[in-house]
């Protein structure tokens, strides 16, 4: 269950919706009242939806899934990048490029191009066999690609789920996810249609503190899912469908020696996982 209280949500301003004249009637079920022309969101219902979203993300990751974090509005960029990086999940915090999901093969080629450019030494004019101008242009290309695609550089396949801040602004991302059958968890304000996502979280999607709180919470769900995934693999003595990456192992610093039996490793790993579980920021 998500570790969040009503007090946390109130302090973060998650109960403030948009002006009443800008509302979407489909959000009526999540609106408590209105004050000074502003809709007030029913945070009791928000808490229920948060728990559902949290459990979904945790379960998805525990079953070897990945979650793509998306938030390109100014208020969300830092939280999206920081929290996704914390649990080593892919993210998009700059402009969403059309086809990032539906044309993933082409996007992957651009990511590979980025990795190629990162291997170059742009200060070695003589060794590269290129002119200073050519190296400068290539370096600019690298910087541009990194800004656009750096967050998904390690995403080798389309994600299992997507977490979105502001589905109105990220309408294209949500649309692409739906075309591929990818479930979406999203912060949904009073001006949006909650029916367009599978796991809506009714809340203010403009307040920086609120965005940070919910994004951090979803990252915690990912971390919990990673620990559960590792624990299940050890208990059953089976390899995961996908090998654990180095960054996942770093989350488990108290991992038992590989040569120990599965029965002996499971209790020790459980203690280590509890001690190392990331805290909400």
Swiss-Prot record:
SUPFAM superfamilies: Ribosomal protein S2 (SSF52313). GO terms for molecular function: structural constituent of ribosome. Residues 233-281 are annotated as: Disordered. Residues 255-275 have a biased composition (Low complexity). The keyword Ribosomal protein applies. One of its GO terms (biological process) is translation. GO terms for cellular component: cytosolic small ribosomal subunit. Disulfide bonds: none annotated. Keywords: Ribonucleoprotein, Ribosomal protein. Belongs to the universal ribosomal protein uS2 family. This is Small ribosomal subunit protein uS2. It comes from Bifidobacterium longum (strain NCC 2705). The gene is rpsB.
């Amino acid at each position: 269950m998500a570790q969040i209280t009503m007090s946390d949500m109130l302090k973060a301003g998650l109960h403030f919706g948009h002006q009443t004249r800008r509302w979407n009637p489909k959000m009526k079920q999540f609106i408590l009242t209105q004050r000074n022309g502003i809709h007030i969101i029913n945070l009791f219902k928000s808490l229920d939806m948060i728990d559902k979203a949290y459990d979904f993300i945790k379960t998805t990751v525990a079953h070897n899934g990945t979650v793509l974090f998306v938030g390109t509005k100014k208020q969300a960029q830092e939280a999206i990048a920081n929290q996704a990086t914390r649990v080593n999940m892919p993210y998009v915090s700059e402009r969403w490029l059309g086809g990032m999901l539906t044309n993933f093969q082409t996007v992957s080629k651009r990511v590979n191009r980025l990795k190629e450019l990162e291997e170059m030494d742009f200060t070695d004019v003589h060794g590269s066999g290129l002119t200073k101008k050519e190296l400068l242009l290539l370096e600019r290309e690298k910087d541009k690609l990194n800004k656009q695609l750096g967050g998904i550089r390690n995403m080798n396949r389309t994600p299992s789920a997507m977490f979105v801040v502001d589905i109105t602004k990220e309408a294209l991302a949500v649309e692409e996810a739906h075309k591929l059958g990818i479930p979406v968890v999203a912060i949904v304000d009073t001006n949006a249609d909650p029916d367009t996502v599978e796991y809506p979280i009714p809340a203010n999607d403009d307040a920086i503190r609120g965005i940070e709180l919910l994004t951090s919470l979803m990252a915690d769900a990912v971390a919990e899912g990673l620990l559960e995934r590792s624990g299940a693999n050890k208990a059953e003595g089976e390899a995961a469908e996908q090998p654990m990456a180095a960054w996942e192992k770093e989350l488990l610093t108290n991992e038992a020696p590989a040569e120990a039996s599965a029965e002996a490793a499971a209790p020790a790993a459980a203690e280590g996982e509890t001690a190392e579980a990331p805290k909400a920021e």
